[in-house]
Amino acid sequence: MSYQVLARKWRPQTFADVVGQEHVLTALANGLSLGRIHHAYLFSGTRGVGKTSIARLLAKGLNCETGITATPCGVCDNCREIEQGRFVDLIEIDAASRTKVEDTRDLLDNVQYAPARGRFKVYLIDEVHMLSRHSFNALLKTLEEPPAHVKFLLATTDPQKLPVTILSRCLQFHLKALDVEQIRHQLEHILNEEHIAHEPRALQLLSRAADGSLRDALSLTDQAIASGDGQVSTQAVSAMLGTLDDDQALSLVEAVVDANGERVMSLINEAAARGIEWEALLVEMLSLLHRIAMVQLSPAALGSDMAAIEQRMRELARTVPPGDLQLYYQTLLIGRKELPWAPDRRMGVEMTLLRALAFHPRMPLPEPETPRQSFAPVAPTAVMTPPQLQQPSAPAPQTSPAPLPASTSQVLAARNQLQRAQGVTKTKKSEPAAASRARPVNNSALERLASVSERVQARPAPSALETAPVKKEAYRWKATTPVVQTKEVVATPKALKKALEHEKTPELAAKLAAEAIERDPWAAQVSQLSLPKLVEQVALNAWKEQNGNAVCLHLRSTQRHLNSSGAQQKLAQALSDLTGTTVELTIVEDDNPAVRTPLEWRQAIYEEKLAQARESIIADNNIQTLRRFFDAELDEESIRPI
């Protein structure tokens, strides 16, 4: 007796046997029951979700000897022949192998003949999107008005490739990909009926690897049965799929949570020795993190497939804060997205896990715990005294002056500690900058520390450190949020961007125009004229010379293209209306820089404001403090008046 694979043996024989796709089955069953049967159906969806199976069930319901029904008998000759694939009036066509227009025409030549055995002649065209354009054109007329005894059932995995004229002539049903639980439940039912031993975790792995396709899941199950010597075991499925078992993936998660870098690298070496698929490793860890998060939300969310590691999963759900869990999940998720760009897949996984360790939320600060009790040992390492800089080779400690007072050292260490906790510590730029900060004479930083120490001597030094909890070290970026908000109040980002791009904001342009009106009578007169924008540019780029009713405008030669007879007439009319007398206007080209035009007045005022802005920035106490203590460099070219 020949063996029949599970995917063929367990093909649905009734609508009730179909897994999922209730939205499609309900519509088809109601149509068959009511007798409202369309002449063309299109089933679309990914591979292995039941497109061809549902089409055959529909053909069985149309040609059952008991009548058109949603529940065919399955015992009549027509039903049995359809199940066996030898029903003469069910013509199945593989469009991928018959793409030529001649094949389509041969098919349509037989449409006119009545069915030989059944009630309807059913044409089942699989992968219909593979037909050529000419084949679609040949099919259009028949598909729109077929004979009463003909039904078309089309199936495709890519409906976007079908012409809209074909889509408009069909009832389209899109079949959804099955979820993991639906596939797992069906596999469990089939294996129980086949009396094959199986493990819940193995079915979970097979269901996830099927990626929504029940046919793929059954094919993988056949392979797993062969690999497991007649049973479906987790070990055999993991080896077949190239995935880690739960214990190894969970051990990696535990090592990351415990910030145990050596354990992480050891587990990665073990995974490499097994020839693991690296992306599958990240997927498995992400799946475990998801299950832990679900257990935190609902303790009953842990299914029976996790029985072997249930205790460890619940312990992680109890001890790991939800915020930390989300951080690990996001880190691994981003690492998986960046994996194709890594020089090597293993390298990408290692860097992802190292990133998770680097951003460990509960990582202690790099400094030892001893400064919390006493800051005295910190003084020699926190501040480099001047003699150490001048005599680096002197071994005798007597040559160095006395260290800073204990209170000053405590304040310095506390300040450094608080800066690290708040995320404001900046990397020093260069060694010369470090040397300039350690000048032995007139060091205002030391003077400031001395003044601060007088104010904090009465306060216990350890209290300064207690204000910075170590647990929040990983969330340094939050400290920058108020700074951004305060900047937005001063000027909008759009205005600042325009200013830095050498563009004047509308507010600044209005100020410059107002001041130009105060300084230049001709600019004031232009502001009172009612002119089109193009004509106004003529007036703004010229200076006026008047003798009685004769007005001469001296236009810059670079703007000669603005001068036209129409512009002169409109400008003369506007001047006449403003003065109440007839003005005789002439325009000549003149590049004399001694007299400014209104636009040149605005530019001159802008230069004055720019010079004032530079002086104000340079003289600002805060800027001077930054330059003195942090060796900041002022980019004067970026200064713009706002």
Curated annotation (Swiss-Prot):
Q: What are the EC numbers?
A: 2.7.7.7
> Which sites bind Zn(2+)?
C64, C73, C76, C79
Name the catalysed reactions. DNA(n) + a 2'-deoxyribonucleoside 5'-triphosphate = DNA(n+1) + diphosphate
Cited CDD domains: AAA (cd00009), HLD_clamp_pol_III_gamma_tau (cd18137)
Q: Name one GO biological process term.
A: viral translational frameshifting
| Role, per record | DNA polymerase III is a complex, multichain enzyme responsible for most of the replicative synthesis in bacteria. This DNA polymerase also exhibits 3' to 5' exonuclease activity.
Q: What is this protein called?
A: DNA polymerase III subunit tau
Q: Which gene encodes it?
A: dnaX
